[in-house]
A protein has these predicted regions:
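N-terminal "domain-start" segment
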Residues: 20-264
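Cleavable N-terminal signal peptides of Sec/SRP-targeted secreted and luminal proteins
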Residues: 2-19
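A positional/structural detector of protein chain ends, strongest at the extreme C-terminus
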Residues: 1-3, 295-296
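Compact beta-sheet-dominated globular domain cores
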Residues: 241-296
């Protein structure tokens, strides 16, 4: 599949999805819990990550109550797995300032295609695709489904600065974007956090809440990154790239901009928020991340 073909073909595919978003999803709350638990359980590529949470802090506090790093194990062996490697290849492709327009080389666009190809080779994404097809929420054609994923996650949109197309859902979620007041938005990838921790650019301040999902650990915390701050963000430590993409895609289809209650492999329920943005008539992922306190 070539990304160049996505531009023309996918307008129709995403248009059909947008039409669906105007009606109630066929996916029930019980089905969300079941399929998300299966996705967590089947995440065979997930990493075993050891955390040193240290001291608890409060939402809104930027006081540093944690002298050490949060990740104290070495996940580099996991980072060599195909989906992790494809994920890492994307991280340096983005302008992190919302005032600067993103531009991409053919090689960088090919890395986006390679990432979608890699995750679709996993049982997690294949299980998600099978489920969505069974509910009439996705095409059975794998190529069409890949194109759908590419558009909702990598399609570019403008929101923060008029006329500047500086964002995508994948960038916003997995990297971050710096606003004009030096605060940051997005930033939900534990993989990217680890990279910045190792480079000395991320200062762990302490945790607000934690949740054990069986295979991953959800943590909310304030962020101090490159001297820019965010008062509250969330990470799903240990999750593979395909699990996070699957959960975000599931909630984009089933509960866009609504409470999307999912289940960990141990049955722990929590919200997965997939916020959307509509740009030039097309609906995209804006951000995708876990939150606490499920609204059942």
């Amino acid at each position: 599949m070539k990304l160049i073909a996505i531009v023309s073909v996918l307008v129709l595919a995403i248009g059909a999805s947008n039409a669906k978003s105007l009606r109630a999803s066929s996916i029930t709350d019980a089905e969300l819990l079941t399929v998300s638990k299966d996705l967590h359980t089947g995440d065979v590529n997930g990493a075993v990550v050891t955390l040193d949470l240290q001291s608890q802090t409060a939402a809104g506090s930027m006081a540093d109550v944690a002298p050490g790093p949060i990740i104290v194990s070495d996940p580099l062996a996991d980072f060599a797995k195909p989906t992790f490697a494809a994920f890492q290849a994307l991280l340096n492709n983005y302008q992190k300032n919302v005032t600067i327009q993103d531009t991409f080389t053919p090689e960088q666009l090919a890395e986006e295609v390679a990432f979608i190809d890699a995750v679709m080779e996993t049982s997690v994404m294949q299980s998600l695709h099978t489920f969505l097809v069974s509910k009439g929420e996705a095409s059975a054609d794998v190529a069409v489904f890949k194109q759908f994923l590419s558009t909702i996650w990598f399609g570019r949109w403008s929101e923060y600065v008029a006329g500047v197309v500086a964002s995508s859902g994948w960038e916003h979620t997995n990297v971050f974007e710096r606003l004009e007041d030096n605060t940051i938005v997005g930033y939900h990838s534990w993989i990217y956090l680890y990279n910045e921790q190792e480079d000395g650019d991320f200062n762990y301040l302490g945790y607000i809440e934690t949740l054990d999902t069986g295979k991953t650990t959800v943590v909310s915390m304030p962020v101090d990154l490159y001297g820019s701050t965010k008062a509250f963000t969330q990470f799903n430590f240990g999750a593979s790239p395909e699990l996070e993409l699957a959960l975000g895609t599931l909630c984009f289809v089933a509960r866009p901009d609504l409470a999307c209650v999912v289940s960990g492999s141990n049955g722990a329920a929590y919200n997965w928020d997939t916020h959307t943005v509509t740009y030039n008539g097309v609906q995209y992922v804006e951000s995708s991340h876990p939150v606490f306190e499920p609204h059942l």
